[in-house]
UniProtKB/Swiss-Prot annotation:
Biological processes per GO annotation: endocytosis involved in viral entry into host cell; virion attachment to host cell
Origin species: Human papillomavirus 25
Function: Forms an icosahedral capsid with a T=7 symmetry and a 50 nm diameter. The capsid is composed of 72 pentamers linked to each other by disulfide bonds and associated with L2 proteins. Binds to heparan sulfate proteoglycans on cell surface of basal layer keratinocytes to provide initial virion attachment. This binding mediates a conformational change in the virus capsid that facilitates efficient infection. The virion enters the host cell via endocytosis. During virus trafficking, L1 protein dissociates from the viral DNA and the genomic DNA is released to the host nucleus.
Pfam annotation, one family: Late_protein_L1
Protein keywords: Capsid protein, Disulfide bond, Host nucleus, Host-virus interaction, Late protein, T=7 icosahedral capsid protein, Viral attachment to host cell, Viral penetration into host cytoplasm, Virion, Virus endocytosis by host, Virus entry into host cell
Name of protein: Major capsid protein L1
InterPro entries reported in the protein's UniProt record: Capsid_L1_Papillomavir, Capsid_L1_sf_Papillomavir, dsDNA_vir_gr_I_capsid
One GO location term (cellular component): T=7 icosahedral viral capsid
Length: 517
């Protein structure tokens, strides 16, 4: 018997208003044939590779933490092109256009030789080797050992006009049901945050807030035991509607498991035994040992983990000291540096050598020491890093049209304020009162709401600021990266009315005649 039934599927209606389409910068930014070369000084930093060193009172930082496993986030400040005194004023019309920078090429220079760094902990939480054990070793109240290892090898850089977005796992707030027991595992959640200069990268133990989630302070090495390791959230940045945080990136990671250990301590999640499923033994993971065996009363821990190794460090697989050219960015922002700034996030632990410095503590002449005594020498650790940044910038124009300004205003209204295009309301009264001695007791109190100053949106974040406002040059052929750019693009540099421009090099070779017999 056929019975009619109403359709159970949902009916999806289109939105009542059209969805705004985000345009690519190539659709409204006009590029010129004027290129600049920008370069930084040699950027150096020195510190302790594992932790900050304070004075005896702990009130003053004496030696900062400088590790090869840290993120280096450079904030490059570029000059405002709208304030340039261009020799050729026909390049743009300041009444109808605004100038912006576009990043066309970058080279991240790294100094210092290749080297492998070692990290570790003098009280590392490991019971023993679980790969090739020769006897059954049960855990005790304290099985910590002095262990060191080399971290995962990592080379990476991310270029954008906004800070790089990172991700890590952190402690989450539990549900308020009142059934939380003391010592139970807390819930965890994925957190997005800006990667700042000095934030630790993943060295093989994951992107985790170790300070909050490893309270024994013994499960990882000293350099991350009190830190939060972050990893760039490539999925979020690739799906960003504007693509300001990541124009493009390059990365190379490698590691392998070198040693296999087991943790000490009480197991939080016991191995399911035979009592589940009403004793049917369907989910039993092991057969109980004999009562005469040591493991009968003291079963070993099942918290297995490896120590990773970055393996070989070679100059054949280097991402640095070579140019990268930006033709098409992964997002809608094709290399336009809004607010005249560029963020370069770098991680490179292939130059991870830590210097060991030994000093005679009693001050005697080393040549007069007859018997070696290790207690008379004080050992220090230092790590150094060396960077140099070079850029190729292209001068671009943005027409001040209504549809373009609406697009930019929806993206970030502060850009229009930076261009001094903000909405200025008509004055209510043409005559205003101005007191001469406004701060004196004889006059009324000054305005409680003074005009707001320009606020840096990243003032609470820590970056390595690099000022390039006076480091630009039109003479591309005078610099290494500039010559590479001219050669790879098939361009030649010319001077027109005092302005350096580049044009295509066209070859005019004659036709080869056929040889007569």
């Amino acid at each position: 018997m056929a019975v009619w039934q109403a359709a159970s599927g949902k009916v999806y209606l289109p939105p009542s208003t059209p969805v705004a389409r985000v345009q690519s910068t190539d659709e409204y930014v006009q590029r010129t044939n004027i290129y600049y070369h920008a370069y930084s000084d040699r950027l150096l930093t020195v510190g302790h590779p594992y932790f900050n060193v304070y004075n005896v009172q702990g009130s003053k930082l004496q030696i900062p933490k400088v590790s090869g496993n840290q993120h280096r986030v450079f904030r490059l400040k570029l000059p405002d092109p709208n304030r340039f005194a261009l020799a050729d004023m026909s390049v743009y019309n300041p009444d109808k256009e605004r100038l912006v920078w576009a990043c066309r090429g970058i080279e991240i220079g790294r100094g210092q030789p290749l080297g492998v760094g070692s990290v570790g902990h003098p009280l590392f939480n490991k019971v023993g080797d679980t790969e090739n054990p020769n006897s059954y070793k049960a855990s005790s109240t304290d099985d910590r050992q002095n262990v060191s290892f080399d971290p995962k090898q990592l080379q990476m850089f991310i270029i954008g006009c906004a800070p790089c977005i990172g991700e890590h796992w952190d402690k989450a707030l539990p549900c308020d049901d009142g059934n939380i027991q003391q010592g139970s595992c807390p819930p965890i959640e994925l957190i997005n945050s800006v990667i700042e200069d000095g934030d630790m990268a993943d060295i093989g133990y994951g992107n985790l807030n170790f300070k909050a989630l490893q309270q024994n302070r013994a499960d990882v090495s000293l350099d991350i035991v009190n830190e939060t390791c972050k990893y760039p959230d490539f999925l979020k940045m690739q799906n960003d509607v504007y693509g300001d945080s990541c124009f493009f990136y390059a990365r190379r990671e490698q590691c392998y498991a070198r040693h296999f250990f087991v943790r000490g301590g009480k197991t939080g999640d016991d191995i399911p035994a035979g009592q589940i499923d009403e004793g049917s033994m369907k989910n039993a993971f092991y057969i109980p040992p004999n009562s005469s065996q040591a493991q009968y009363n003291n079963l070993g821990n099942s918290m297995y983990f490896p120590t990773v190794s970055g393996s070989l460090v070679s100059s054949d697989a280097q991402l640095f000291n070579r140019p990268f050219w930006l033709q098409r960015a992964q997002g809608h922002n094709n290399g336009i540096c809004w607010f005249n700034q560029l963020f370069v996030t770098v991680v490179d632990n292939t130059r991870n050598t830590n210097f060991s410095i030994s000093i005679n503590s009693d001050g005697t002449d080393v040549s007069k020491i007859t018997d070696y005594n290790s207690q008379k020498f004080t050992e220090y650790l230092r790590h150094v890093e060396e960077y140099e940044l070079s850029l190729i910038l292209q001068l671009c124009k943005v027409p001040l049209k209504a549809e373009i300004l609406a697009q930019i205003n929806a993206m970030n209204s502060n850009i229009l304020e930076e261009w001094q295009l903000g909405f200025v309301p008509a004055p209510d009264n043409s005559i205003q009162d101005t007191y001469r001695y406004i701060d004196s007791l004889a006059t009324r109190c000054p305005d409680k709401n003074p005009p707001k100053e320009k606020v840096d949106p990243y003032k609470n974040l820590h970056f390595w600021d690099v000022d390039l406002t006076e480091r630009l040059s039109l003479d591309l052929d005078q610099y290494s990266l500039g010559r590479k750019f001219l050669f790879q693009a098939g361009l030649q540099q010319t001077t027109v009315n005092g302005t350096k421009t580049v044009s295509s090099r066209i070859s005019t070779r004659g036709i080869k005649r056929k040889r007569k017999n």
